[in-house]
């Protein structure tokens, strides 16, 4: 048991050491910004494997109507000059993120239970046992068991979140049914703090507006992360020793 606990402490310390080394790398400097990368290489944004219908035939990006060669209007374009909406790998689509959520929960639990058991041993198979025991034992009260348990708990959650952002995402994959897998990242550095926004998900081409924008509520399997790194984020985090203590302390 002691060896397992020691191994757990060493593993947790190794993980914390990696995080500490990253923070030590820019002591006295502003936190570095990551270079431009392929959004498909971000964690969790690889090729998606989802239940799909039969693949559709690929459509031309700017199809023309062969039966009306003299017409200036194309059959598959919602605008007069063409369709600016993203529909191929590498295209860019603008995602409007407007989150305004609130949740309020109140839970109360009360439980109590008691039990009692008494037994005597004054006779056995018709034989009187009152004289079998010495004077220190009362055969009318051989065993007496009792238990009492109670539980009282309460919990409440009152949370309000509001985020309003706009980020450009890249189409990283076109699924067989035509849906688009998108991924985007945006970094903004202000003084010694880097704010990072990540978004991934699956969008329908029909939900993309004529201005090539889509709301985050129309993205399936959406993963939105808004955080940062720097001096302010470090000040809000507990010390790694305290984190280890909270993880390993069983009481």
From Swiss-Prot:
PANTHER family in alphabetical order: FLAGELLAR L-RING PROTEIN
Q: Where does this protein reside within or beyond the cell?
A: Cell outer membrane; Bacterial flagellum basal body
- Quote the residue positions with lipidation, kind N-palmitoyl cysteine: 18
Task: Specify whether Lipid biosynthesis is a keyword of the entry.
Answer: no
Signal sequence: where? 1-17
Residues covalently joined to lipid (S-diacylglycerol cysteine): 18
Topology in the lipid bilayer = Lipid-anchor
Task: Give the protein's recorded name.
Answer: Flagellar L-ring protein
Cellular component terms, GO, for this chain's entry?
bacterial-type flagellum basal body, distal rod, L ring; cell outer membrane
Which domain of life does this protein belong to? Bacteria
- What GO biological process terms are annotated to this protein in UniProt? bacterial-type flagellum-dependent cell motility
**Primary localization class, coarse:** membrane
Q: What does this protein do?
A: Assembles around the rod to form the L-ring and probably protects the motor/basal body from shearing forces during rotation.
Molecular functions (GO terms): cytoskeletal motor activity
- Subunit structure of this entry? The basal body constitutes a major portion of the flagellar organelle and consists of four rings (L,P,S, and M) mounted on a central rod.
Pfam family of the protein (one): FlgH
Classification from the root reads: Bacteria, Pseudomonadati, Pseudomonadota, Alphaproteobacteria, Maricaulales
Q: According to its UniProt record, which protein family does this protein belong to?
A: Belongs to the FlgH family.
Record keywords: Bacterial flagellum, Cell outer membrane, Lipoprotein, Membrane, Palmitate, Signal
What organism, scientifically named, is this protein from?
Maricaulis maris (strain MCS10)
Write out the transmembrane intervals.
Answer: none
């Amino acid at each position: 048991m002691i060896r397992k606990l020691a191994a757990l402490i060493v593993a947790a310390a190794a993980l914390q050491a990696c995080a500490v080394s990253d923070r030590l790398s820019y002591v006295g400097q502003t936190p570095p910004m990551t270079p431009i990368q392929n959004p498909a290489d971000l964690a969790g944004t690889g090729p998606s494997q989802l239940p799909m219908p039969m693949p559709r035939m690929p459509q031309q990006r700017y199809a023309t109507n062969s039966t009306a060669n003299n017409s200036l209007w194309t059959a598959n374009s919602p605008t007069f000059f063409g369709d600016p909406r993203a529909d191929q790998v590498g295209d860019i689509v603008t995602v409007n993120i407007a989150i305004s959520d609130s949740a309020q929960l109140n839970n109360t639990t009360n439980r109590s239970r008691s039990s009692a058991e008494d037994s005597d041993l004054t006779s056995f198979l018709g034989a009187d046992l009152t004289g079998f025991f010495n004077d220190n034992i009362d055969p009318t009260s051989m065993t007496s068991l009792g238990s009492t348990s109670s539980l009282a708990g309460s919990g409440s959650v009152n949370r309000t979140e509001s985020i309003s952002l706009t980020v450009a995402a890249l189409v990283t994959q076109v699924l067989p049914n035509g849906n688009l897998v998108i991924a985007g990242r945006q970094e903004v550095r202000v003084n010694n703090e880097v704010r990072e926004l990540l978004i991934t998900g699956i969008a329908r081409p029909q939900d993309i507006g004529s201005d090539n924008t889509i709301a985050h509520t129309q993205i399936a399997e959406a993963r939105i992360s808004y955080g940062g790194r720097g001096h302010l984020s470090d000040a809000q985090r507990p010390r790694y020793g305290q984190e280890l203590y909270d993880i390993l302390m069983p009481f």
